[in-house]
């Protein structure tokens, strides 16, 4: 059986990266929430 998690740095960056998050309203909301929580890492 094939495993569901097949790591790829490029796909990770494209889907969950900072630039991608910044593009959409929802993504910006995610960043804002993580900033207010004081997360060291905002995105992948």
UniProtKB/Swiss-Prot annotation:
Pfam family, one: Ribosomal_L34
Record family assignment: Belongs to the bacterial ribosomal protein bL34 family.
Organism this protein belongs to: Gluconobacter oxydans (strain 621H) (Gluconobacter suboxydans)
Coiled-coil spans in chain: none
Position of the signal peptide: none
Domain of life of the native organism: Bacteria
Region (Disordered): 1-44
PANTHER family to which the protein is assigned, alphabetical: LARGE RIBOSOMAL SUBUNIT PROTEIN BL34M, MITOCHONDRIAL RIBOSOMAL PROTEIN 34 FAMILY MEMBER
Cellular component GO terms, alphabetical: ribonucleoprotein complex; ribosome
GO molecular function, one term: structural constituent of ribosome
Record keywords: Ribonucleoprotein, Ribosomal protein
Bias (Basic residues) ranges: 10-19, 31-44
Full protein name: Large ribosomal subunit protein bL34
Any single GO BP term: translation
